[in-house]
Amino acid sequence: MTENIRQIQVSNHVMMQEISRMFTLGKESVTITVRGYSMRPFLEDRRDKVVITPPETPQIGEVVLARIAPERYALHRVIKKENDSYIMQGDGNPLYMTERFTQADIIGMARTFIRKGKPHQTTDFTWRCYSFVWRMLKPFRRILLGIYRRLP
């Protein structure tokens, strides 16, 4: 039996307001489709999905959905905490491309990645190892991503 799923497209701002409202009303998670290439090689544009849960205090290495400017949002990895703010960066972004946000800017936490149709919990040992290794390869990412983009 096939489930009827209705998809709609709305602006990011409208979607983030709705996700925040749903969490306020007690919804435990929301699944969104990835748009963009900033989280390559882990997440691919329009192919992969992310299960977002209500906001918590993020740890270094966790992926959060946050407002980074008025009506601008990003799903990126937390790389640093500075005083009352956090610094985030997309896994596929150049080293100089970072965004700053505060706890109040967090829309939600990425807890499950659905990659090529297969769910991966962010708490899984394998996923945590991949994330750790990728963070350690920061100086070589540009080269590695160049190779990755050329793969069939």
Residue ranges and their predicted role:
Residues G26-V30, D48, I60-E62, R72-A74, ...:
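A generic structural signal for short beta-strands and their flanking turns/coil linkers
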Residues M1-T57, K116-P152:
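Protein maturation boundaries and topogenic segments
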Residues E56-T57, R67-P152:
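Acidic/glycine-rich C-terminal interaction modules and beta/coil loop segments
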